[in-house]
Swiss-Prot record:
InterPro entries from the UniProt entry: A1-4-GlycosylTfrase_dom, GlycoTrfase_DXD_sugar-bd_CS, Nucleotide-diphossugar_trans, Put_A1-4-GlycosylTfrase_plant
Protein name from the UniProt record: Uncharacterized protein At4g19900
Pfam families named in the record: Gb3_synth (PF04572), Gly_transf_sug (PF04488)
Region (Disordered): 65-117
Superkingdom in the source lineage: Eukaryota
PANTHER family, sorted: OS07G0567300 PROTEIN (PTHR47213:SF1)
Taxon lineage: Eukaryota, Viridiplantae, Streptophyta, Embryophyta, Tracheophyta
Compositional bias of kind Acidic residues: 89-114
Stored SUPFAM superfamilies: Nucleotide-diphospho-sugar transferases
Length: 644
């Protein structure tokens, strides 16, 4: 009985295995049928009962049971199934979950729209401009790594035609894509001022949009801060953020310690100015030979030591002689400046004399056939060949004339290696107004000289006052530096020239010759003091001479005054006026004009004593060879090899 039971149980297990295999095959067959039906079905979509919103789902076999096709005019119940249902309760579950699915679909749709908007915004504004380093960087955010691909859609060359892309492919110096708006602004930059974000008149830099206010406030802060204060505000790197090095920490410039050292060096320079000449000291060279002499009186050992140093002593004596010779050479080569103790220079005259004593010594020592005064208020490098030609023309006509050039801007020995070296009597002196204007109505100008020299037309007004005072105190001839002397001036007495102008005739002080203590010059000095105007250019010069001359000649002592003032026509001193002088700097191209200029050249040489080339009008012009002006400049040259 037990055996029969055991045999049954063995067959029963086999039967169970067979049944399991059959069920497994049935399940696989059913699953295969479902999959085959799913692959042949149309793309899965689900439209809600309200038919207002459509939600897209990814293709998956897990949602294949929810594929429902809605008819055009049917309601919620008018749906047809295209496939068999696994469970007969699917209808009930689906009907009960319609409302839940609608809510879930609406939430999913809103989330998907937010994601799309977020991706779109990220693709258009995923970069920002780093003002510190001057480059474009990627903005930091908390998006998923799967969404990073959206960043580069805007820079794709083969982009779609949707028009949502806000920029195209463009790369800067650091190979970073640039936004289209940035490139559009860069194209509008046309000047350096625009690149530096400066305001030039009404024009505003296009790069100032957005952060121009910050730029102005930052520059204002740097200007107000004492540490970064500067006189050059606009283009100073300490005040202009666009000119600062973005890789540096803070602002570059002098620290407070550097400023202290700079101030100390400036004080040292003020204590020992360049114009002050310090004699070289040779004290150390003189002491050592004396020590060797002392060694000879101390014993045999000392004597032996002295013998071994005899050669060194000879070398040191030679060095001492070289130092003395170099010192003498430096005295010759170094320039001399007016420093309050020296007022003029001429070889053979003590340089430490006062201004009046220097002038008297210069005129007394040299046998002067004529005293000539000139004024030069420009830097020495501006004394060009054409001005040199004026002085040469004077010295060629008057070889023994004593010329004094009054100047505040050139060295006292400015002509030492030129005219003085050639034995011409030319000296440079800085006027001491306190001595020059003494016993004249204009002496008050000496006390206000420091404030007077700050006025706009000081160089011109200073020259006009000095020429009147020098002629009144010493007597002689005054010439402007742009006057060429064509004939002898020895016959001139109390003479001034008329200037021919379009608006009318007036006197011109470029050429004047007066005796010492001239009454006319005294009237001019008094008029200068009474009517001085620091804002008028000609009021204290040509206009002043014209006013005083009319009053002087129409006064009570008419006959006597005519002897004290002789007015010559414009053809004597100014044959060509300032309005026409520029026409004679060019060589005429037509034969008729050349012949006309040749006739004018001969006529001026015969009738005129001077030729004025009006440097205030023609300073920027260069006379062409064989032009009328070039002929007059080279007519009486001494150093003719110097090129104009």
């Amino acid at each position: 009985m037990l055996r029969s039971r055991r045999s049954r149980s063995r067959h029963g297990a086999q039967a169970c295995a067979v049944m399991s295999a059959v069920l497994l095959l049935a399940s696989v067959s059913l699953l295969y049928t479902r999959l085959s039906l799913f692959s042949s079905h149309s793309p899965n979509h689900l439209r809600s009962g309200s038919s207002e919103d459509t939600v897209l789902f990814p293709d998956s076999v897990l949602v294949s049971d929810s594929d429902v096709e809605t008819t055009g005019g049917g309601g919620r119940g008018s749906t047809t199934s295209t496939e068999d249902r696994i469970d007969e309760h699917d209808d009930a579950i689906e009907d009960d979950g319609v409302s839940n699915e609608e809510d879930e679909n609406q939430d999913a749709e809103q989330e998907q729209e937010v994601d799309l908007n977020r991706n779109k915004a990220a693709s258009s504004s995923g970069f920002y401009f780093d003002h510190v380093n001057g480059v474009i960087r990627r903005a930091f955010n908390k998006r998923s790594i799967d969404e990073w691909d959206y960043d580069y859609t805007g820079f794709s060359i083969d982009s779609d035609s949707s028009g949502d892309k806000s920029s195209r492919a463009a790369f800067g110096s650091d190979d970073v894509p640039l936004d289209e708006s940035i490139r559009r602004k860069i194209v509008e930059v046309t000047s350096v001022e625009d690149a530096l974000l400066l305001k030039s008149g009404k024009k505003v830099s296009p790069l100032r949009q957005g952060w121009g206010d910050w730029f102005d406030k930052k520059g204002d802060f740097l200007r107000r801060d004492r540490m970064f204060k500067s006189n050059i505000e606009t283009l100073n790197p300490l005040n202009n953020p666009m000119l600062q090095d973005p890789d540096s920490v803070g602002n570059t410039g002098l620290t407070r310690g550097d400023k202290v050292v700079q101030k100390w060096r400036l004080n040292q320079i003020k204590r020992n100015p360049f114009m002050a000449k310090k004699p070289l000291s040779v004290v150390s060279e003189k002491k050592e030979p004396n020590e060797f002499r002392l060694l000879s009186s101390v014993g045999e050992i000392k004597r032996g030591e002295r013998k071994t140093l005899d050669n060194d002593e000879k070398i040191e004596r030679e060095e001492q002689k070289n130092v003395e010779s170099e010192r003498k050479h430096d005295e010759v080569t170094e320039h001399m400046y007016a420093d309050g103790t020296k007022w003029g220079y001429y070889p053979g005259i003590e340089p430490s004399l006062s201004f009046s004593d220097f002038m008297d010594s210069f005129f007394r020592k040299e046998k002067c056939s004529m005293r000539v005064f000139m004024v030069w208020n420009s830097p020495g490098w501006m004394f060009s060949v054409r001005h040199q030609r004026g002085l040469e023309s004077l010295l060629s006509q008057h070889r023994d004339a004593c010329v004094v050039v009054f100047s505040e801007t050139v060295e006292l020995d400015f002509f030492r290696n030129s005219f003085v070296k050639d034995s011409y009597k030319v000296a440079v002196a800085m006027p001491n107004l306190d001595e020059l204007l003494q016993d004249t109505p204009t002496h008050v100008f000496a006390s206000v000289w420091f404030d007077w020299r700050k006025t706009k037309f000081y160089p011109t007004h200073y020259s006009e006052l000095v020429r009147l005072a020098a002629l009144y105190k010493y007597g002689g001839v005054y010439l402007d530096s742009d006057v060429i002397v064509l004939g002898s001036l020895s016959s001139l007495r109390n003479t001034i020239g008329m200037e021919d102008q379009v608006a009318g005739e007036s006197l011109n002080g470029a050429v004047m010759s007066f005796e010492k203590k001239s009454p006319f010059l005294l009237e001019c000095l008094n008029e200068y003091y009474l009517t001085y105007d620091d804002k008028c250019l000609r009021c204290n010069g040509a206009d002043l001479l014209t006013r005083v001359a009319k009053r002087f000649l129409n006064g009570k002592n008419r006959r006597m005054n005519q002897q004290e003032l002789n007015i010559r026509p414009s053809s004597v001193f100014f044959p060509i006026n300032s309005q026409q002088i520029t026409n004679y700097f060019a060589y005429p191209a037509i034969e008729d004009e050349r012949s006309q200029q040749d006739e004018s050249f001969k006529k001026i040489l015969n009738e005129s004593l001077t030729f004025h080339f009006w440097n205030s009008v023609t300073s920027s012009l260069i006379p062409e060879p064989e032009s009328l002006v070039a002929k007059f400049l080279d007519h009486s040259c001494i150093r003719c090899s110097d090129v104009l």
